Amino acid sequence: MNDKKFAFVMCANNEQYEKEALYYIERLEVPEGYSCESVVIREAESMAEGYNRAMQLSDARYKIYMHQDVMITEKKFLKKILSLFKNREIGMIGLVGSPVFPENGVMWYGDRIGSLYTQGSEGYGTYIFGQVAAPCEYVEAVDGFLMITQYDVPWRADIFKKW
């Protein structure tokens, strides 16, 4: 495991999205002494299967699992990740999550906290799901559009069989 390395992991089936996501990744500020790689999985059976393949291909301690249509515009993104992961009890972080996992198992139907910058019907803007009182709050589920880990745990491809 390389403690000074970030891996950006995405399953891709749209070349235009993939190229744009990589464009933004290449423009992020990389903390001194750290390196980055991008691991793009094409023709994955499912996101979980693709993420498991990528996990085996990368020795990076920090893995950023992201959808192909996510464009990371915060230049200091990697520095912020390191700041949060100073707490070794934190295994995964994301931008949006559910403090309590909904009974129906669908995160989008429960209360959520966090925010993201997105394109809506009125143009681009920040969408806030719920206020976050601290730089990091405990949630039971993280939205899959962007998930960052500091420990490798296999993805449940036996349960999550779709994109």
Q: What are these language model-derived features?
A:
Residues 44-58:
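Glycine-rich, basic loop-to-helix element that forms the pyrophosphate-binding segment
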Residues 66-68:
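Catalytic metal- and UDP-sugar-binding loop of GT-A-like glycosyltransferases, i.e.
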Residues 1-27:
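N-proximal low-complexity "stem/linker" segments adjacent to membrane-targeting elements
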Residues 34-46:
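A short beta-strand-loop structural module common to alpha/beta enzyme folds
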Residues 125-149:
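A recurrent flexible, glycine/aromatic-enriched loop bordering the glycosyltransferase active site
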Residues 63:
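Short aromatic/hydrophobic "clamp" motif used to bind/position activated sugar donors
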Residues 44, 71, 75-114:
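Conserved donor NDP-sugar-binding/catalytic core segment of glycosyltransferases
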Residues 140-141, 152-163:
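Donor nucleotide-sugar recognition loop
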